[in-house]
Design a protein with these regions (language model features):
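Donor nucleotide-sugar binding/catalytic pocket of nucleotide-sugar-dependent glycosyltransferases
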Residues: 144-196
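Short alpha-helical donor nucleotide-sugar binding micro-motif in glycosyltransferases
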Residues: 156, 261-262, 269-274
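Short hydrophobic beta-strand element within catalytic cores of glycosyltransferases
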Residues: 299-302
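Aromatic "clamp/platform" in nucleotide-sugar-dependent glycosyltransferases that forms part
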Residues: 102, 282
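A conserved mid-protein helix/loop that constitutes part of the nucleotide-sugar donor-binding site
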Residues: 32-33, 205, 209-228, 241-245
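A charged, aromatic-enriched C-terminal amphipathic alpha-helix characteristic of glycosyltransferases
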Residues: 339-373
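Nucleotide-activated donor-binding/catalytic signature segment of Leloir-type glycosyltransferases, i.e.
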Residues: 245-265
């Protein structure tokens, strides 16, 4: 496959109506972005695909009863209205249900799907039990771990298959009792794939971090690198519980700017404006933003804590750092690369990313085909008894 011949429609059409039910709003976090991108990626290959999830409209959350997420006021916990959810499932008449988030939203959806005899695929993206230690201590951390462990185990018991996007996450799913745990890849926003690719940068001068401003992302390593590399310019794009702290730090660093939340429509432009993307995370089940930068022919530096480094076909297009404390040192080394070295690495990164996207599409279509009800009109009618 050559880069110029890459096609977004190489996989055949299959019979199926796929319904994704998630409490992650589209593009508000990694999981929300994953399934919005997956819908676009599969829409030409299945009969129908739709997502039921909360939405942020005019800065107001809609789609259920919303509670603030402890430790992060930019995210919400959503409690679904079971009767509304039941009606939406009935109206769509799915042949397979995909549930990517634990908690009450996912559990209610799984129970409704199970009662109707619909096959369920669980997307296991985040090990919240590990994140709990970064946000809370003592009793609150213990309660959070217990809740998510219970929730994940309950979802796994109700599902036919569990998919995770790294070997580590597959192993964790196995330990928690998930049936048929398997590996999935990562789709990308179609704009990243079809927008004309700008030339590979001739040198490394402009550095980008893009993601949630949260403890697990280790954003302070980017601030420290900006202080240590005055000849480079740094941009931090995103929102999260650490935004105020990051903005305070950036106010005294001349070569660092903080953009805040960036609309999804600007992602291609933002990546193309920079030479290198950095992701120094302490916990990262995959790291989709790294794949996004790879497909735009940009240099990508990631920590070895990112799940993307477990993919041999992708590490050929990455530069992996074992310690975020040496981020500035590694950036300085990359700034000394020749134009040829940079071109070779960045074009290889794009080729790796394109192959991965195509492989992931085939995998998802295979899973949908495997668990598909052959006759959508035969789907049972969902009923919920009022008590």
């Amino acid at each position: 496959m050559t880069l110029s011949s890459f096609s977004l429609a190489e996989q055949p059409q299959i019979s199926g109506r796929v319904l994704i039910i998630s409490d992650a709003a589209p593009h508000r976090n990694g999981v929300g972005a994953y399934y919005a991108d997956l819908m676009d990626d599969l829409s030409d290959h299945v009969d129908a695909i739709q997502m039921i999830s909360p939405e942020l409209i005019d800065e107001k959350w809609q789609g259920g009863w919303m509670l603030p997420l402890p430790g992060d006021n930019t995210q919400k916990l959503c409690l679904p209205n079971a009767f509304e959810l039941q009606q939406k499932i009935r109206d769509f008449r799915p042949t397979v249900i995909v549930i990517p988030t634990p908690g009450l939203f996912g559990l209610v959806a799984a129970l409704l799907a199970k009662r109707a005899g619909l096959p369920i695929i669980i997307g296991f993206h985040t090990w919240f039990e590990k994140l709990a230690g970064l946000y809370w201590n003592g009793v609150q951390s213990g309660l959070t771990r217990t809740f998510f462990e219970f929730s994940n185990k309950a979802l796994f018991r109700l599902a036919q298959k569990t998919l995770a996007n790294s070997h580590e996450m597959v192993a964790i799913a196995d330990q928690l009792g998930a049936p048929n745990a398997a590996l999935m890849g990562t789709p990308l926003d179609q704009r990243l794939l079809i927008s004309p690719v700008v030339p590979v940068p001739k040198s490394v001068r402009r550095v980008l971090f893009m993601g949630r401003l949260a403890a697990e992302k280790n954003v302070m390593a980017v601030v420290e690198a900006a202080n240590a590399c005055p000849d480079l310019t740094f941009t931090i794009a995103g929102d999260g519980p650490l935004r105020e702290d990051i903005e305070t730090q950036a106010s005294v660093v001349d070569n660092l700017r903080v953009l805040g939340w960036v609309d999804r429509s600007r992602i291609v432009e933002l990546i193309d404006e920079h030479d290198v993307l950095v992701l120094p995370s302490q916990v990262e089940s995959f790291g989709t933003v790294a794949l996004e930068a790879m497909v735009r022919q940009r240099l990508v530096l990631v920590s070895d804590a990112c799940g993307i480094v477990e993919w041999p076909d992708l590490t050929r297009g990455l530069k992996v750092i074992s310690d975020s404390k040496i981020l500035a040192t590694e950036l300085s080394r990359c700034a000394d690369w020749s134009e040829f070295e940079l071109y070779s690495h960045c074009t290889r990164a794009r080729a790796c990313a394109l192959r991965h996207v195509q492989w992931n599409r085939r995998q998802w279509l295979d899973h949908i085909r495997e668990y598909n009800l052959l006759d959508p009109d035969a789907c049972p009618v969902l009923t919920v008894q009022a008590r």
